[in-house]
Regions:
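Compact disulfide-stabilized, cysteine-rich extracellular microdomains and processed peptide cores
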Residues: 2, 8, 12-62
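Amphipathic/hydrophobic helical signal segments and adjacent flexible N-terminal regions
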Residues: 2-6, 54-116, 122, 127, ...
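Short amphipathic alpha-helical molecular recognition features
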Residues: 37-41, 74, 130
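Generic beta-strand structural signal
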Residues: 77, 140-142, 165, 197, ...
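Central antiparallel beta-sheet cores of small beta-barrel/beta-sandwich binding domains
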Residues: 92-183
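Mixed-charge, glycine-accented linear interaction segment located at domain edges/termini
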Residues: 182-228
Length: 228
């Protein structure tokens, strides 16, 4: 059996506010106009004169939750770019245990009426070898707390996963799976993907069951949010 390596992702659904870039001291504009270098030399000005110093973060439109379709508001905390650098672990009876890194991007599509989030994930080994990629969509079943994830994977699998949202957590359970005819991985019988958001960190765990092995943890990883 070769590496399946599906991304895992449990979360807190607290509505965030988009941070405004402003000066907290009314004298900032005068200070900076008379001495531009003060933005680098003086800690007080650097901290309290962000607008005048031009130290405002750049918000990418695809991560700006003010653009989010109302139906998707309960999962707004998923939106962003998440990276786990050497924080992933792969285990399964048929392969050696090893560490990996992964970047997940969950973004808002351009169309205002599109009721799903774009999802991509890319994993690589400690020596930068490409291990696994997948892409798909995340949405919510109308008038429920059921979250749906669809994926197309670089190893030839296609999945439909659904699960309830409880507080900080989503637990996706495999509902349907497709595979190309010549894929050599062992037949996947079941899959459970768990995502948890904990104070700005995204913890992920994926458990799988094959025809010859019971349900057990296959991958786990801790992501840090890298987008603004």
């Amino acid at each position: 059996m070769r590496l399946l390596l599906f991304s895992g992702v449990f979360l807190a659904f607290v509505a965030p506010t988009v941070q405004q870039c402003v000066d907290s001291d009314g004298a900032c504009s005068s200070w900076v106009a008379s001495d531009r270098g003060a933005c680098q030399r003086k800690e007080y000005i650097k901290k309290n004169c962000r607008k005048s110093c031009g130290n405002c973060p750049i918000y990418e439109a695809k991560f700006d939750t003010r653009r989010l379709n109302p139906q998707l508001q309960p999962i707004r905390q998923l939106v962003g770019r998440w990276k786990g650098e050497h924080t992933g672990k792969v285990t399964f009876p048929t392969i050696p245990t090893f560490k990996y890194s992964e970047e997940v991007e969950i973004s808002i599509p351009d169309g205002a009426n599109i009721r799903s989030l774009n999802y991509t994930a890319a994993a690589w080994s400690s020596d930068k070898e490409d291990l696994h990629r997948e892409s798909g969509y995340i949405t919510i079943k109308p008038n429920t707390r059921e979250v749906i994830l669809t994926t197309v994977m670089s190893n030839g699998f296609i999945t439909v996963e659904e699960g309830p949202m409880f507080g900080n957590n989503i637990k996706f359970i495999l509902k349907d799976i497709g595979r190309i005819s010549f894929v050599r991985d062992e037949h996947l019988h079941n899959l459970v993907r768990e995502w948890t958001l904990d104070q700005g960190y995204l913890r992920a765990r994926l458990s799988i069951q094959t025809l010859s092995h019971r349900m057990q943890e296959h991958t786990s990883i801790l992501y840090t949010k890298t987008s603004v």
